[in-house]
Swiss-Prot record:
UniProt pathway annotation: Nucleoside biosynthesis; alpha-ribazole biosynthesis; alpha-ribazole from 5,6-dimethylbenzimidazole: step 1/2
GO MF, one example: nicotinate-nucleotide-dimethylbenzimidazole phosphoribosyltransferase activity
Reaction(s) catalysed (UniProt annotation): 5,6-dimethylbenzimidazole + nicotinate beta-D-ribonucleotide = alpha-ribazole 5'-phosphate + nicotinate + H(+)
Keyword Transferase tagged: yes
Name recorded for this polypeptide: Nicotinate-nucleotide--dimethylbenzimidazole phosphoribosyltransferase
Stated family: Belongs to the CobT family.
Organism of derivation: Pseudoalteromonas translucida (strain TAC 125)
Cross-referenced Gene3D superfamilies: 1.10.1610.10, 3.40.50.10210
Keyword line: Cobalamin biosynthesis, Glycosyltransferase, Transferase
A Pfam match: DBI_PRT
E.C. code: 2.4.2.21
Active site per UniProt: E320
Name of encoding gene: cobT
Amino acid sequence: MFKIAPLNNQFDHLIHNKINNKTKPLGALGQLELIALQLVKILSQTIKSDVEFTAFKAEICNPTLVVFAGDHGIAAQGVSIAPSEVTAQMVANFVAGGAAINIFCQQLGWQLEVVDCGILEKSPASKVHDCRLGNITAPLNLHMAMSTAQVKQGFSNAKSLVLQLKQQGCNTLAMGEMGIGNTTSAAAIMAAILNLPVTQCVGRGTGVSDELIARKINVVEQALQLHKAHLADPIALLAAVGGFEIVHITGAMLAAAEQGMAVIVDGFICSAAAMVAIKINPIVKEYLIFAHCSNEQGHQQMLSKLEVKPLLQLDLRLGEGTGAALSLPLLQAALGFYNHMASFADAGVEQVV
């Protein structure tokens, strides 16, 4: 379904030379230099010649952050501090402009889109994209969360949305999520893919008690035992323990990479979706930039297993794409120095190593 081209290494020598000849010691801008390298490679995929590349200016265009919302049947078993009704209430808050992600997007220059992937109370707002796969997933410790047909429909929905955003000029896409109970799904995905004990994968989400943590661990262990025959295949894994929003995020990552877009990965839930996407097509990882390490237990280990270094560590545990949103100034700074910082020759400065 997704044909993703590996990043072109043809111009690596030109990128490295340009970075290394800026008026600074080698490597002095640290991780920003690596981000500049990755972004330039992603955004220059259509360039064919050295001459064309030399004239090319890599820029972030119409950065868009999409919040995918979905309800989880497992929430009824008390694995979260909030009831499922809060998902729809927060979608209404996104539409009204009152959530943290609204403020961050307004301040930092993101276009914000909200997608109903399947919540108990359908949003009446015309601003919300209707990609519903149902009202709510089935409890993952009792049944398959959804069918494989629903997973494939979610991928199709995500692909259509990404194509629409691409046509609007977007070349940098971030994802956020809203779904009461979705850290339980993400923990199950993490445990299945990394073959880790559930206790290392389950965290407090938005702040549950010790009693709820124990219940959450038990639920995930039950789910993994019930669905052990489905854990190796990524599509079957999503059907077994995923969420409607996690399915769409996974599909959107794959679709965005297929379109040559930079993909900014948010926190624990989005990183779980990224692991599934990588399992489906490992090349997608070349397009992923991990924005932050959240305060959710397991996220740091997840990032370590993926061998990626996040840009920020702010102890966030909100979701919504807030960490991804906050990374945009760093991405812009990386391209800013790459495009505009003087070289030693331009500035008449003696080159230092």
